[in-house]
Design a protein with these regions (language model features):
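Alpha-helical substrate-recognition element adjacent to the catalytic core
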Residues: 2-8, 15-138, 210-213, 217-229, ...
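C-terminal cap/substrate-recognition subdomain and adjoining C-terminal extension
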Residues: 101-375
């Protein structure tokens, strides 16, 4: 065997690289990427829900699946999370948590099926026990219920899983998710957690349960981002006390942009979410561009990433073009720049210690309902 044939036999290729060891046929397999878990609040995050009074809460169990309306862009985003994970051969899990009663479970599952949403679990709050015992002030208490369920879910999650959390600005999601992230990271001592939960006036039985669960958690800084849907249009500056990990967003196009920078959804997913807003919510391309610029101003997108995304989305026809080049020169420029782009290195998000007692005082002074209502 001579020439190239002999060389190929002696120095075989392994994948796309030449092996340095004569006769070597394989290389060590790459480690599987870490599993990723997406935990979604259901009401006012996935669904447009209305239960601000007891009468409206009682009406919810009688709604049909077709009566329920999803938030604009959320269906396209969740589909993309699953699709992208499959393409990357990464294990991905989507879970929903709802403070609504389990009696609406059938309608919710039918709604998710209608939307074509693949999910791995859903949990509801059993309100009946509070009604039977006359404990009406715990009907709307969410902190204890959600925190306990999140901790249970973390214990059952794959080791090393990275998490992204999705909630809204109506009541307690920012503080619930932040507490959860700090507890599983080992940043919050058990006694400090108990003091915080007492201040929030949660169900005493839940407090005991949460303390026991927190002792079973293997510490891991697993929560990468917390997304808060600004359904009430709360000023984003009010969330600065929660740190850079928490991202307040005005729409799911903004959420998709940050997830794209995080590397969990491709650009095509951002385009799909943006188009769903154009088609279903009377958004204009100019308004989508303003959404991107808003994220950049608030420093949730790096400046170079924002510039790159703006150009890519202009080329996709999603944003109005602001360039002076024609279409063909722009495409040549984009191809050249992509070839020179280095792999994105995602630095750790700086997480300053949250002063929970002070934060609770400030939020309750503003009229926000964080924990259980006073007796």
């Amino acid at each position: 065997m001579t020439g190239w044939s002999g060389l190929l036999a002696r120095w075989p290729r392994s994948g796309r690289r030449w092996s340095l060891a004569p006769g070597a046929r394989t290389v060590a397999p790459r480690p599987a990427p870490a599993a990723v878990v997406y935990r979604w609040d259901l009401d006012k995050t996935y669904l447009k829900s209305d239960f601000e009074s007891l009468r409206k809460m009682m009406r919810v169990p009688f709604e049909r699946a077709e009566d329920k309306i999803d938030e604009p862009g959320v269906v396209a985003l969740i589909r993309a999370l699953k699709t992208s994970a499959r393409q990357e051969q990464r294990a991905a899990f989507v879970y929903f948590i709802s403070a609504s009663p389990p009696q609406i479970g059938r309608a919710i599952r039918e709604k998710l099926a209608l939307d074509g949403i693949e999910y791995d679990g859903i949990v509801f709050k059993d309100q009946l026990q509070h009604l039977v015992r006359g404990r009406f002030r715990f009907l709307r208490e969410q902190v204890g219920f959600k925190l306990a369920e999140l901790l249970k879910a973390r214990i059952a999650a794959p080791p090393g899983a990275v998490e992204f959390l999705f909630g809204d600005d109506w009541e307690s999601d920012p503080i619930i998710y932040s507490l959860y992230a700090d507890v599983i990271a080992g940043r919050l001592e058990h006694d400090a957690l108990a003091d915080i939960l007492v201040r929030l006036r949660i169900d005493p039985a839940r407090l005991v349960e949460i303390k026991a669960l927190s002792h079973r958690i293997a510490p891991a800084d697993a929560v990468r981002r917390i997304f808060i849907n600004l359904e009430r249009r709360t000023p984003p500056d009010r969330f600065r006390s929660f740190g850079a990990r928490l991202v307040p967003t005005f729409n799911y196009f903004q959420t998709a942009l940050v997830l794209h920078e995080e590397g969990v959804v491709p650009l095509t997913a951002v385009v799909e979410v943006g188009r769903s807003l154009l088609e279903r919510s009377a958004y204009s391309r100019e308004r989508l561009r303003n959404s991107l610029d808003d994220l950049a101003r608030r420093a949730y997108l790096a400046p170079n990433v924002a510039v790159s995304l703006r150009r890519d989305l202009e080329d996709a026809g999603l944003l109005p073009s602001t360039g002076t080049l024609g279409a063909w020169p722009r495409q040549l420029w984009r191809r050249w720049r992509r070839r020179r782009t280095r792999p994105l290195v995602r630095p750790p998000i700086t997480t300053a210690a949250i002063e929970y007692p002070r934060l609770i005082d400030v939020w309750e002074a503003s009229g926000s309902r964080l924990g259980g209502e006073t007796s």
